[in-house]
Amino acid sequence: MASSSAPRFRVYSKYLFLTYPECTLEPQYALDSLRTLLNKYEPLYIAAVRELHEDGSPHLHVLVQNKLRASITNPNALNLRMDTSPFSIFHPNIQAAKDCNQVRDYITKEVDSDVNTAEWGTFVAVSTPGRKDRDADMKQIIESSSSREEFLSMVCNRFPFEWSIRLKDFEYTARHLFPDPVATYTPEFPTESLICHETIESWKNEHLYSESPGRHKSIYICGPTRTGKTSWARSLGTHNYYNSLVDFTTYDVNAKYNIIDDIPFKFTPNWKCFVGAQRDFTVNPKYGKRKVIRGGIPCIILVNPDEDWLKDMTPEQSDYMYSNTVVHYMYEGETFINYSFASGEDVTASQ
């Protein structure tokens, strides 16, 4: 008994390419027999060609073009028999002819006489879009579309089959061509209303606002909540801000620095690349494709005492941290808020 998991045979096409190995039938006889077997699909053209292999055994190749699409689910449906010997059965390999022009050229390439060839009907030259045409069409879509929606609509109209099975890939391309605009951060407080410890000020001037021939150092700030850490860090310029999780799909290549805010050490991917201001590192976003991050910019890491990274690090990780960052633990009463500037206003700083 055949296994139920065996693949089901089916050929569904207007155009068929048949090969009968070791077939001694005359091409004209095979052609006439196939016209009868395929009559319900309204054949338009049939070419049957006998080919002698090096060992002298004859093979029969047949190209069939039908008006209607043939649905063949029985691999024995096109078996042929000899009139003189009904027990001699010739079984074909049945395939869809994806390119009729190529198949016709292939089966007639070495025919040495009309005796080995039989044709009936008028050959239908089926034009199939070449790779160059498809590339040109896709290039035109990319260059002329002005939004994600327009790009996807044009792809759907031009490549409906590919669109139906590769929609996720086309959506990824659309997001790459037309990314979401980077939101401009508006500081919660004027820069003049924020202050920082001299150690932090020194780091800012040396590693954030000046060029360095080597790699910049990052800064690690551990301190209580609601002391203005985040407000100060986000007021320094264009940056990538990550809170709760690191999402590389929103990475801005024009940012001057990164901020990692309230993310536990164990949940910070590529932490060495961030801390060490490394260049050209590869990331693998959970819901996106791998991408190369240009990097080379310092990072501000902000944590509260209950999630102190250094407490969770091995000695080797701690050594890397101290070698690549300025570590600052806020002292009691330290704040980034300049209360004298606030002049008695009700100031509530984040973080």
From Swiss-Prot:
Residue ranges of region Transactivation?
246-264
TM spans (from-to): none
Q: Where is this chain's protein located in or outside the cell?
A: Host nucleus
Binding residue positions for ATP: G223, P224, T225, R226, T227, G228, K229, T230
Positions of short motif RCR-1: 17-20
The record's section on SUPFAM superfamilies has: Origin of replication-binding domain, RBD-like (SSF55464), P-loop containing nucleoside triphosphate hydrolases (SSF52540)
Q: Which residues bind a divalent metal cation per the record?
A: E51, H59, H61, E110
The UniProt entry annotates the active site at: Y106 (for dna cleavage activity)
GO MF terms, alphabetically ordered: ATP binding; DNA binding; endodeoxyribonuclease activity, producing 5'-phosphomonoesters; helicase activity; metal ion binding; nucleotidyltransferase activity; structural molecule activity
Main location per UniProt? host cell
Which residues does the UniProt record annotate as the domain CRESS-DNA virus Rep endonuclease? 10-123
Question: What is a biological process (GO) this protein takes part in?
Answer: rolling circle single-stranded viral DNA replication
UniProt short sequence motif RCR-3, positions renumbered to this chain: 106-109
Q: Where is this motif: Nuclear localization signal?
A: 286-296
RCR-2: where is this motif? 59-61
**Documented EC number(s):** 2.7.7.-, 3.1.21.-
Q: Which UniProt keyword terms apply here?
A: ATP-binding, Covalent protein-DNA linkage, DNA replication, DNA-binding, Endonuclease, Helicase, Host nucleus, Hydrolase, Metal-binding, Multifunctional enzyme, Nuclease, Nucleotide-binding, Nucleotidyltransferase, Repressor, Transferase
According to the UniProt entry, the note on domains is:
There are 3 rolling circle replication (RCR) motifs. RCR-2 is probably involved in metal coordination. RCR-3 is required for phosphodiester bond cleavage for initiation of RCR.
Instruction: State the similarity comment.
Output: Belongs to the geminiviridae Rep protein family.
* Subunit structure and binding partners: Homooligomer. Rep binds to repeated DNA motifs (iterons). Forms the O-complex, which is a Rep-DNA complex involved in the initiation of RCR. Part of the C- and V-complexes which are RepA-Rep-DNA complexes involved in the c-sense and v-sense transcription.
- Protein name, as recorded: Replication-associated protein
